[in-house]
Design a protein with these regions (language model features):
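Glycine- and acidic-residue-enriched helix-capping/strand-helix junction motifs
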Residues: 16-28
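Glycine-rich beta-alpha loop elements in corrinoid/cobalamin-binding modules
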Residues: 34, 44-51, 74-139
Length: 139
């Protein structure tokens, strides 16, 4: 049995970018490398908006942000990956969820955190990155 808590790093969607895979947020990768060097496996979930939702949001900017509009690229510590529509069950296997959040991602990070707390109150969620650093009271 693994004595380490299961950790999931999360990159919330960048709904305001044309291509959400233009750049990588390096913080989670650095932390994953550090943990791996110390024998602690972790997975990475990259949430991104479906093309259909992007088209609808462009046509109607007032359309609310919905988690159901997301896909999830899950990269596991064993090297396997999956790319599927958002399913809240993704969080079931984890005890710690760590989000790296920049200000344009904050609304989605709050939605994700709310969903995690509603469905899985046992999970510890951590929000880091530039947004919480500068907007601590808001977070």
């Amino acid at each position: 049995m693994n004595s380490h808590k299961q950790i999931l790093f999360v990159k919330p969607p960048d709904r305001f970018l044309e291509n959400e895979f233009v750049y990588q947020q390096l913080g989670p990768h650095y932390l994953q490398s550090f943990l791996a060097e110390h024998g602690v496996p972790s997975d990475l979930a990259i949430f991104y908006q479906t093309e259909e939702a992007r088209t609808e949001r462009c046509a109607n900017p007032e359309r609310p942000l919905l988690l159901e509009d997301l896909k999830t690229l899950l990269i596991r510590s064993d090297g396997t990956s999956s790319d599927e529509l958002f399913d809240e069950k993704i969080f079931l296997d984890y005890e710690v969820i760590a989000m790296s959040v920049m200000t344009p991602q904050a609304s989605d990070a709050y939605l994700l955190n709310k969903k995690i707390k509603e469905l899985h109150p046992r999970i510890t969620s951590v929000i880091g990155g530039s947004h919480p650093r500068y907007y601590q009271k808001q977070v």
